[in-house]
Amino acid sequence: MSAACAVSREAQPALPPPPRGDRDPPAKAMRRGLRRGREEEQDQERLPWPAESGGGDPEGEQEAWRSGERRRRQPQEPRALAAAARVEEEAEEERMEREHFRRIINAFRYYGTNMHERVNRTERQFKSLPANQQSLLPQFLPHLDKIRKCIDHNQEILQTIVNDCVHMFENKEYGEDGGGKITPASTFDMDKLKSTLKQFVRDWSEEGKPERDSCYQPIISEIVKNFPKERWDFSKVNILVPGAGLGRLAWEIAMLGYACQGNEWSLFMLFSSNFVLNRCSEVNSCKLYPWIHQFSNNKRSADQIRPIYFPDVDPHSLPSGSNFSMTAGDFQEIYSECNTWDCIATCFFIDTAHNVIDYIDTIWKILKPGGIWINVGPLLYHFENLANELSIELSYEDIKNVILQYGFHIEVEKESVLSTYTVNELSMMKYYYECVLFVVRKPEEKCFE
């Protein structure tokens, strides 16, 4: 990014915190505390030491000095202990980061085992039926064999993603044991991984185009309307997309010539976006079977095993000189520089907050005076009903009131923008969201410190 789009040090490629409800203590705060501890240790090192005795009562002078030294040093000891504790905290944080990185890598590698166990269970249950009932469905077991082949193919793609990502974020050492024993992954991690496979449909397949048109296109249209080429040098319009997922919205914005940065903190998303953005260039050269996990609501057996192809465009086809990047980390920790961004575009994002007011506060701070915030999405709060997790579930009315009290001016507001999210178009069950679209502007004269 240009100097105008500088972000804090934590925005550089570094291991982001675990996704959603499983976050570690903020690394930024611990690093700041560690710096304070080091400064205090340096203060101790600058304490005066006794000069060579030149006469009088050397032993008395030395004892007097030692007594005074004890008095001077004693108040420093709690600080030294605190500094040592902070060092231990940072070491623990790094250990947790390595463990989280390896846990997600393991989930990618465990996918095939997990899915084969699922299919094997279905086969056992089918074979427990009376023989006359089994004979009514001669294609059932061959269909399961087809699913097994799809699983193996998906695992090959996931292994390719893993092979590339073990060296991401300067964490090469984290991947050195990547060929080690695969251990069972949690149900939570496997659900996240299966959901990530559907993100390829949403962001990088032809099948996902209607969904992108419903929620990405309104954002892009507002960007073009507010930053027209007649009045703006696109390359100097700095746009941030928090919660960028696999990066398609940010990529589309950069494709128009704007300087765009996507931000994401889920390793499932970051590993996958790294693969599609940096390793895929030929259109529709890759294939996935994202619907094989869905054993219910299939009209036809073939619907379950149909493939999707990606990417539907060449991610490397950005115009020469384009300014497009992705950062890894927590949105609130990374972006702290006041008055930096011309536009912030959030899509299905604000309900990922523990406290959506924190998101609003960060957006207000980092937007330039006169900058705009464009939002599309529902309010399906991700931490609702999770034990031991802060979750403030506000209505849109409440959110709107908070936005106005911060000082934003509402320029566009639509309360029923119909959209889906990673929908299976052939499924017998679909979820539709009536999303809110709004465009709000930070006044020129306002600057929040």
Swiss-Prot record:
Instruction: Spell out the reaction equation it catalyses.
Output: carnosine + S-adenosyl-L-methionine = anserine + S-adenosyl-L-homocysteine + H(+)
Cellular location of this protein?
Answer: Cytoplasm, Cytosol; Nucleus
- Show the segment(s) annotated as Disordered: 1-91
One annotated GO molecular function: carnosine N-methyltransferase activity
Q: What's the pH dependence, according to the entry?
A: Optimum pH is 7.0-7.5.
- Provide the disulphide bond pattern: none
Summarize where S-adenosyl-L-methionine binds, as residue positions.
Q199, R202, G243, E264, D330, F331, C347, Y359
| Thermal dependence of catalysis | Optimum temperature is 40 degrees Celsius.
Any idea what this protein is called? Carnosine N-methyltransferase
Organism this protein belongs to? Gallus gallus
Which gene specifies this protein's sequence? CARNMT1
